[in-house]
Swiss-Prot record:
<dbReference type="GO" id="GO:0052906">
    <property type="term" value="F:tRNA (guanine(37)-N1)-methyltransferase activity"/>
</dbReference>
<comment type="function">
    <text>Specifically methylates guanosine-37 in various tRNAs.</text>
</comment>
<dbReference type="InterPro" id="IPR023148">
    <property type="entry name" value="tRNA_m1G_MeTrfase_C_sf"/>
</dbReference>
<dbReference type="GO" id="GO:0002939">
    <property type="term" value="P:tRNA N1-guanine methylation"/>
</dbReference>
<comment type="subunit">
    <text>Homodimer.</text>
</comment>
<keyword id="KW-0489">Methyltransferase</keyword>
<feature type="binding site">
    <location>
        <begin position="133"/>
        <end position="138"/>
    </location>
    <ligand>
        <name>S-adenosyl-L-methionine</name>
    </ligand>
</feature>
<dbReference type="InterPro" id="IPR029028">
    <property type="entry name" value="Alpha/beta_knot_MTases"/>
</dbReference>
<dbReference type="GO" id="GO:0005829">
    <property type="term" value="C:cytosol"/>
</dbReference>
<dbReference type="InterPro" id="IPR029026">
    <property type="entry name" value="tRNA_m1G_MTases_N"/>
</dbReference>
<feature type="binding site">
    <location>
        <position position="113"/>
    </location>
    <ligand>
        <name>S-adenosyl-L-methionine</name>
    </ligand>
</feature>
<dbReference type="Pfam" id="PF01746">
    <property type="entry name" value="tRNA_m1G_MT"/>
</dbReference>
<keyword id="KW-0963">Cytoplasm</keyword>
<comment type="similarity">
    <text>Belongs to the RNA methyltransferase TrmD family.</text>
</comment>
<dbReference type="InterPro" id="IPR016009">
    <property type="entry name" value="tRNA_MeTrfase_TRMD/TRM10"/>
</dbReference>
<protein>
    <recommendedName>
        <fullName>tRNA (guanine-N(1)-)-methyltransferase</fullName>
        <ecNumber>2.1.1.228</ecNumber>
    </recommendedName>
</protein>
<keyword id="KW-0808">Transferase</keyword>
Length: 248
């Protein structure tokens, strides 16, 4: 997968290229990331990249010409086949479903805003989609871009050691993940659930699914609004509720 990033702080993306899962993906040639800094497209000695907004008000906007030229350079490198995404609090909220949609793209260009944002005409003429990682304000689009890159790259074939790791993640099936345990079998008097030590794969699968359903009900019940439960899921959830009520 090829990713282009337009950013005033390309150094920040070493967190993607040099570390962890994404770093290994880059090293193995499964993920390619290039950056374009609008400062490199300025024409004044101060390398100015901000400008005053029409109508006044506090703050500055990213200057149109350097930003637009940087986006154009990224498009040329992508062969004009890439989808251009602007990271914005006004965009579509990123969910696992959205991540799966974006992961189908072979090439993405991510535009990271700074200051008070970017000129609306840039969004109208250069941007294909706007995406947000949540209803809160950050200093720029770099952290949202890295969040998007990390989540999308996990779905690129070969990036994870086992594709099942991605399939079992929270939200991959619309539910929260089940609890996980490793050694030792007993920690501060709390034992690993016996079913996980049983070796019975079907019982383990059912337990994990039931825990996933129950945890979602307790912590994020609104997620069920978009789910159509199977007969098995309905039965397991009912058992979870009955057990929880009996233990009260």
């Amino acid at each position: 997968m090829w990713l282009g990033v337009v950013t005033l702080f390309p150094e920040m993306f070493r967190a993607v290229t040099d570390f962890g899962v994404t770093g290994r993906a880059v090293s193995n040639g499964l993920l390619e990331l290039q950056t374009w800094n609008p400062r490199d497209f300025t024409h004044d000695k101060h390398r100015t990249v901000d400008d005053r907004p029409y109508g006044g008000g506090p703050g500055m906007l990213m200057m149109v010409q350097p930003l637009r030229d940087a986006i154009h350079a990224a498009k040329v490198a992508a062969g004009d086949k890439a989808k251009v995404i602007y990271l914005s609090p006004q965009g579509r909220k990123l969910t696992q479903q959205g991540v799966e949609e974006l992961a189908k793209s072979e090439r993405l260009i991510l535009v990271c805003g700074r200051y008070e944002g970017i000129d609306e005409r840039i969004i109208q003429t250069e941007v294909d989609e706007e995406w947000s990682i949540g209803d809160y304000v950050l200093s720029g689009g770099e952290l949202p871009a890295m969040t998007l890159i990390d989540s999308v790259s996990r779905l690129v074939p070969g990036v994870l050691g086992k594709q099942a790791s991605a399939e079992q993640d929270s939200f991959s099936d619309g539910l929260l993940d089940c609890p996980h345990y490793t050694r030792p079998e007993s920690l501060d008097g709390i034992d690993v659930p016996a079913v996980l030590l049983s070796g019975n794969h079907e019982n383990i699968r059912r337990w994990r699914l039931q825990q996933s359903l129950g945890r979602t009900l307790l912590r994020r019940p609104e997620l069920f609004e978009n789910l159509a439960l199977t007969d098995e899921q309905t039965k397991l959830l009912a058992e979870f509720v009955n057990t929880a009520q009996a233990g009260e």
